[in-house]
């Protein structure tokens, strides 16, 4: 089975370079959630499931803020970041305007590598994606890459209420099913509630969202005897694997360190669900 993060026993390290990006546009999609487009050469290297570090301009704030890549434009000259304001750094980002410059670090992490995934797993006929909350944006680029490969996915996205940010974007690339906590749109409940109301029979599950959701996805995949790939989100410091601040427990020992650990920022953020303890 295709395993993320390791090829021939060696961890894959993404190319990393600090660069200056230019703000192309920014808008608020929902309360506290912003849609930011950045012009950057790093877009040429970006893929589904990866992320960049965005540096605040405040000199007192040294560390970049990790933000998942939502989308890469067609000519690979710009990155789309959809993020939630969660602290001083992201609050500063929400004030960016067209023409502003910002320092970024990337491209970071190991993502889905769609072409390799599909080549190694021809049995993945019904590909299903699951996004919850701010875990929704990273699934858009994955949907886009799957559709480009001729494998339009079934996409299950979960919201708190009727603020369905990015729903229309997902509809360009796959069949979309919505779940809302308050029942205002679609299925009342979560993404798995929505799945069980359809005739969709997944051959693989791919997810990003709250930890409770990821645990449920892992359990559902286990019961169906199919693989699940989950994108883990964790507080990060360096973003390049040096500080060990984003380690997760694994079910297997690392061949080199001989410990049951993996760094989310380098070996992840995408993991085969059965290989991590969550």
Q: At which residue positions do the language-model features occur?
A:
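N-terminal amphipathic/basic-hydrophobic helices that include classical n-h-c signal peptides
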Residues: 1-12
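Structural signal for conserved beta-strand scaffold positions within catalytic alpha/beta enzyme cores
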Residues: 25, 71, 178-180, 230, ...
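Local cysteine-cluster metal-coordination motifs and their immediate loop/turn environment
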Residues: 211, 234-269
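Ferredoxin-reductase
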Residues: 14-98
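FNR/FR-type flavoprotein reductase catalytic core
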Residues: 88-235
């Amino acid at each position: 089975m295709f395993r993320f993060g390791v090829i021939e026993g060696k961890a894959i390290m993404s190319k990393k370079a600090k660069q200056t990006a230019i703000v192309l546009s920014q808008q608020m999609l929902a309360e506290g959630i912003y849609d930011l487009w950045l012009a950057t050469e790093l877009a040429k290297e970006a893929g589904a499931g990866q992320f960049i570090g965005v540096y605040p301009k405040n000199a007192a704030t040294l560390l970049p803020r990790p933000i998942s890549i939502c989308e890469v434009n067609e000519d690979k000259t710009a990155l789309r970041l959809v993020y939630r304001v969660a602290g001083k750094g992201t609050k500063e980002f929400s004030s960016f305007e067209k023409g502003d410059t910002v320092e970024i670090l990337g491209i970071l992490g190991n993502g889905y590598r769609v072409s390799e995934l599909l080549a190694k797993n021809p049995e993945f006929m019904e590909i299903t994606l699951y996004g919850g909350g701010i875990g929704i944006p990273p699934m858009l680029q994955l949907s886009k890459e799957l559709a480009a490969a001729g494998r339009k996915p079934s996409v299950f996205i979960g919201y708190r209420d009727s603020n369905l940010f990015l729903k229309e974007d997902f509809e360009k690339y796959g069949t979309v099913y919505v779940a809302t906590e308050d029942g205002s749109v679609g299925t009342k409940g979560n993404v798995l509630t929505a799945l069980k109301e359809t005739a969709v029979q997944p051959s693989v599950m791919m997810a990003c969202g709250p930890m409770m959701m990821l645990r449920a996805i892992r359990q559902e995949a286990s019961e169906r005897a199919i693989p699940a790939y989950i994108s883990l989100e964790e507080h990060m410091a360096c973003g390049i694997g040096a500080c060990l601040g984003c380690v997760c427990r694994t079910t297997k020992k690392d061949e080199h360190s001989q410990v049951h650990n993996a760094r989310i920022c380098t070996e992840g953020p995408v993991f085969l669900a059965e290989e991590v303890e969550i």
